[in-house]
Amino acid sequence: MEIRVANKYALGKKLGSGSFGDIYVAKDIVTMEEFAVKLESTRSKHPQLLYESKLYKILGGGIGVPKVYWYGIEGDFTIMVLDLLGPSLEDLFTLCNRKFSLKTVLMTADQMLNRIEYVHSKNFIHRDIKPDNFLIGRGKKVTLIHIIDFGLAKKYRDSRSHTHIPYKEGKNLTGTARYASINTHLGIEQSRRDDIEALGYVLMYFLRGSLPWQGLKAISKKDKYDKIMEKKISTSVEVLCRNASFEFVTYLNYCRSLRFEDRPDYTYLRRLLKDLFIREGFTYDFLFDWTCVYASEKDKKKMLENKNRFDQTADQEGRDQRNN
């Protein structure tokens, strides 16, 4: 028997599940367009779908932010219908044998920084920056990286006055320990700087294949968090970025130098990584490591056409320079 949501969407296969509930694919019964549907039990002890739907509404219209098409309660479930996206960067990382090239890391970093800056501009911090929460799109948006999962997001300043939340200590760790900033481990209230620092660890994870504080043995969750914190604090930025370009050292040192209420200089960070991109002679052609592995034949063809166009332009520029 076909299950329908809002008498408009036919529920299909299950895509996954999380602490909040389950995610399904659904089709519009008229247009046959596919969507993602999040289901959360109305009896959930820690409901987050209502909060998340409000966040999506606030962030609505932003590049790389999924659009919500319907939210409501039906039967025993709170339901949210939103854009169906492609795999996460974590999925693609696994697909690429758990190592990304420098070019792919820099192209993803550029987009991820843009997404984080946009969320911050709307007065919220994400508080769970990790590869699983960045997804590529589908079809025409296959090269666009989206930011998702705002269940842990928090307002860090007043919308009108821009008064920042107060500095606090003794907070429990919110987010994912692997990528959490050192200040988050120390129990300090999170602010913009922590999202940016977490991104730095994500980038090093992509470049190295793993982080030094992964796979630590522990007897409890608290013990594991403590061991991750100890290892993170004792591993210098220089050691963490040993085989990487100095720009990554600069990036992380900058993040750690920020004060609680500071607005990160997103433009400076983008320029820092863009300069490295240019110095390496890369072309921003949206050909990621996963492109040929994941993309459909149609998408592949489109990307190769783009690459040929870029190559022809580069060849022409080279000829022009030689002729001058």
Curated annotation (Swiss-Prot):
A GO molecular-function descriptor: protein serine/threonine kinase activity
Root EC class: transferase
Any GO BP: peptidyl-threonine phosphorylation
PROSITE patterns, alphabetized: PROTEIN_KINASE_ATP (PS00107), PROTEIN_KINASE_DOM (PS50011), PROTEIN_KINASE_ST (PS00108)
Span of domain Protein kinase: 9-278
Active site, per annotation: 128 (proton acceptor)
Residues given in the record as ATP binding sites: 15-23, 38
UniProt keyword list: ATP-binding, Cytoplasm, Cytoplasmic vesicle, Kinase, Magnesium, Metal-binding, Nucleotide-binding, Secreted, Serine/threonine-protein kinase, Transferase
A Pfam family annotated for this UniProt entry: Pkinase
GO cellular component: cytoplasm; cytoplasmic vesicle; extracellular space; host cell surface; microneme
Localization: Cytoplasm; Cytoplasmic vesicle, Secretory vesicle, Microneme; Secreted; Host cell surface
Lineage top rank: taxon: Eukaryota
SMART domains given in the database record: S_TKc
The protein's Enzyme Commission number: 2.7.11.1
Named cofactor requirement(s): Mg(2+)
Subunit structure: Interacts with rhoptry protein RON3; the interaction is direct. Interacts with CK2alpha; the interaction is direct. Interacts with nucleosome assembly protein NAPL. Interacts with RAB5b. Interacts with host GAPVD1. Interacts with host SNX22.
Function: Serine/threonine-protein kinase likely to be involved in many cellular processes. Phosphorylates rhoptry protein RON3, nucleosome assembly protein NAPL and DNA/RNA-binding protein ALBA4 in vitro.
Protein name: Casein kinase I
Taxonomic path: Eukaryota, Sar, Alveolata, Apicomplexa, Aconoidasida
